[in-house]
Amino acid sequence: MTEEVYQNLQKHLDQFPIGYPATKTGVEIRVLQHLFTPEEAEIAINLKLAYETLENIHKNIENHISLAELEIALDTMVSKGLINFKREGENKYYAIIPLVVGIYEYQVDKLTKEFIEDFEQYKDNEFALELLSTKNLQFRVIPLEQSLTPENLVASYDELRKIIENIEEDSIGLTKCICRQSKDLQGQPCSKTSERELCLYFGNTGRLFLDQGWARPINKDETLELLRKAEKDGLVLQSGNTKDPEFICCCCECCCGILSKAKDIPRPAQFLASNYYAEVDKELCTGCGTCLERCQMNALKLVNNISKVNLKRCIGCGLCVSTCPEEAIHLRKKETEVVPPSTVDDLYAEIAQIKEELRQKMKK
């Protein structure tokens, strides 16, 4: 019976846009067992991606649990980073969340070696295929400020300063990078930076992190300073793929599950949303190789002592631009602009549509 409740939870999670596919090894069940008690798994099966009130959730649960008992259980699940939560006035709202971005990121300061071992196995196999099947539209690359030239008409969702300006300052939470925490526990510390507080959350998610003590508050000026330092350290800025993102992470290919997976495939440019690509001025390039060292996607190589960009691999982050001593590289805007969805709900709807189109193609 205990095994069955986790199997039911796996099926429940798998029906959402960011699914939770089954495996032959059962590792996906072990991941859930690390996180949920059987009682919590039973409750989670009754939750939706859309926020619901405590009272509505109680109506959906068949087992005999009082409203007060359910509230305690849900609040415990929130504190464990298993579900989403927000408060509006006196009302409390709860929702299910996917494994990524969601449950995994909410495990900051709660990781164990046993969980990491099973999570890594799942992440590198069936779950990786799940993310790849959606082209990973949960993420977009924000180009470095100094890499954008005046002739580039930069949309607000591509301009770091505008993104931060639009955020409510009391919702900004700075937390430790879950990917680097995981690598530290595995004895594989980050090769790019010794910093660990490198993930920012905003809006409802930021308030959740702050309320739960998973993050500390910082202001907008501190936020911009942190992100600019991350750029200097050679980190790629990735945000949620919405017009007003609820997170920005400072990423590297040695720790970040998304960037490392992108680097492993032939065409990272198709895997990460970005509106830019790097272009080299052959007349100015001296072949010093600085850009090759900065690029995390192996998108640059020297041909006849001149840097050449592989457009299939370039994700438009601008790391190569900001440190070119000859100013021979600049970012060029793509002809077709990728406009992010307005909200997370719109994002999930877009991902669901892409997955359905793929299913229909596979049937033919």
Language-model segments: which ranges?
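Short amphipathic alpha-helical interface segments
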Residues: 35-60
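Ferredoxin-like iron-sulfur electron-transfer modules
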Residues: 63-65, 94-96, 235-244, 265-316, ...
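Catalytic cores of enzyme domains
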Residues: 125-277
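Flanking helices and flexible, charged tails adjoining ferredoxin-like Fe-S electron-transfer domains
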Residues: 311-364
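Short, amphipathic alpha-helical interaction segments positioned at domain boundaries
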Residues: 91-128
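Iron-sulfur cluster-binding cysteine motifs and their immediate structural context
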Residues: 52, 56, 60, 82-86, ...
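Long, low-complexity, charged/polar intrinsically disordered regions in eukaryotic proteins
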Residues: 1-29
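Short amphipathic alpha-helical interaction segments
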Residues: 63-79
